């Protein structure tokens, strides 16, 4: 059964991450890496027709449908393990000797629309959702976000939109991006991995007009 475990448990499954990648995350709050996951077509085929559900948030905030996957999910399971193992390498860039891997990862599918600016560590404003967030370490404990894009090979951000917009250099606690000193739009190129600091980088998914598929993993601060 899937459970929260130290990311080091999956270190052997992680793709090779260089010291330069770790240094870039530490200095810039994000890093973009291409070519680490050669099995994108296989993953897309396994996830494209799966059942997805609405989130608990309003479609005025986000329009994606999601499903959760674990290391026990067939073809996808190996990639889930690989994403969980990334935390062991990147932990020093977010100020920890080690971080914990979540029990599950999230697949987000957009047919159209996007996701308003937010922090992955930001509590929701709705009271009921806030208490759910507060009681869930897998939400309130996030320190590191890793996103693997599984878009179609001919997805073109210039035509279809769907970029991940990162608001960089923000003051602590800014979930809106208003204090950003720079903005970076990352195209959802298939096989591209984006890693950023969950508590430092407000971000948004810009509107897409074509199906956009991504697999996300949130690493957690270790329990005190």
Regions found by a protein language model. Name each.
Residues 45-46, 120, 208-209:
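Short coil/turn segments at secondary-structure boundaries
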Residues 4-94, 106:
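Non-heme Fe(II)/2-oxoglutarate
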Residues 142, 151-224:
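Catalytic core of Fe(II)/2-oxoglutarate
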Residues 114-122:
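Histidine-centered catalytic micro-motifs
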Residues 107-110, 126-156, 219:
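Short, conserved beta-strand element in jelly-roll/cupin
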Residues 17-19, 132-133, 201-202:
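Eukaryotic intrinsically disordered and solvent-exposed regulatory patches
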Residues 24-26, 137-142, 187:
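Extracellular/periplasmic catalytic domains that process cell-envelope and extracellular macromolecules
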Residues 94-106, 159-160:
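A short coil-to-beta-strand element that immediately follows conserved catalytic motifs
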């Amino acid at each position: 059964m899937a459970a929260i475990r130290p990311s080091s448990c999956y270190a052997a499954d992680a793709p090779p991450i260089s010291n330069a990648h770790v240094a870039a995350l530490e200095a810039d709050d994000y890093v973009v890496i291409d070519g680490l996951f050669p099995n994108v077509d296989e993953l897309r085929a396994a996830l494209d027709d799966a059942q997805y559900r609405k989130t608990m948030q309003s479609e005025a905030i986000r329009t994606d449908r999601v499903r959760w996957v674990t290391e026990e999910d067939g073809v996808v399971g190996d990639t889930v393990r690989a994403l969980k193992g990334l935390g062991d390498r990147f932990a020093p860039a977010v100020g920890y000797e080690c971080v914990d891997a979540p029990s599950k990862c999230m697949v987000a599918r957009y047919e159209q629309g996007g996701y308003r600016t937010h922090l992955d560590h930001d509590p929701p404003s709705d009271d009921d959702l806030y208490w759910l967030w507060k009681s869930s370490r897998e939400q309130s404990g996030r320190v590191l976000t890793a996103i693997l894009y599984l878009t179609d090979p001919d997805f073109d951000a210039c035509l279809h939109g769907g970029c991940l917009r990162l608001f960089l250099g923000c003051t602590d606690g800014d979930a809106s991006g208003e204090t950003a000193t720079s903005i970076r739009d990352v195209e959802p190129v298939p096989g591209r991995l984006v890693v950023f600091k969950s508590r430092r980088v407000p971000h948004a998914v810009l509107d897409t007009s074509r199906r956009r598929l991504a697999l996300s993993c949130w690493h957690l601060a270790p329990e005190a």
